[in-house]
Amino acid sequence: MQTLLAIFVGAGFGALLRWFLGLKLNALAPLIPLGTLGANWLGGYLIGLALAFFSTHPLLSPEWRLLIITGFLGGLTTFSTFSAEMVSLLQWGRYGALALGVALHVGGSIGMTLLGIFTFSFIQRIGG
């Protein structure tokens, strides 16, 4: 039951943050909604931090990993919305925006994950 609660609570907070980002940012660039992009980049960065952190703290309760990674970051990031937005661009014949959107989401998310891992490693090195 604790496992389900951890995932449920984390996912709820992640989804709320994703909704807020969409509400505040999507209208700024309708072709490539910045709320969706921001949610995926932020999620990528935070999962990099989380993966690095949990790899150095193997004795933490598994519920923490489920709360943060499966729940919160699963609720925050959104492959389905990204897919729907890219298919809309394809249907509208906006091929340049489609290519840019795919590159920004996929490349950016992977880059942000690597940056999160690097950030954690850097903080570990300078902190002790």
UniProtKB/Swiss-Prot annotation:
One term under GO cellular component: plasma membrane
Catalytic activity: fluoride(in) = fluoride(out)
Binding-site residues for Na(+), renumbered to this chain: 74, 77
Coiled coil ranges: none
Pfam families in UniProt: CRCB
InterPro entries the record matches: FluC (IPR003691)
Keyword field: Cell inner membrane, Cell membrane, Ion channel, Ion transport, Membrane, Metal-binding, Sodium, Transmembrane, Transmembrane helix, Transport
GO molecular function, one term: metal ion binding
Parts of the chain that traverse the membrane: 3-23, 34-54, 67-87, 98-118
Chief place of localization: membrane
Activity control note: Na(+) is not transported, but it plays an essential structural role and its presence is essential for fluoride channel function.
Keyword Oxidoreductase among UniProt keywords: no
Domain of life: Bacteria
GO BP annotation list: cellular detoxification of fluoride
Membrane topology: Multi-pass membrane protein
Subcellular location: Cell inner membrane
Family: Belongs to the fluoride channel Fluc/FEX (TC 1.A.43) family.
Function as written in the Swiss-Prot or TrEMBL entry: Fluoride-specific ion channel. Important for reducing fluoride concentration in the cell, thus reducing its toxicity.
Name this protein carries in UniProt: Fluoride-specific ion channel FluC
Origin species: Wolinella succinogenes (strain ATCC 29543 / DSM 1740 / CCUG 13145 / JCM 31913 / LMG 7466 / NCTC 11488 / FDC 602W)
Gene from which this protein is expressed: fluC
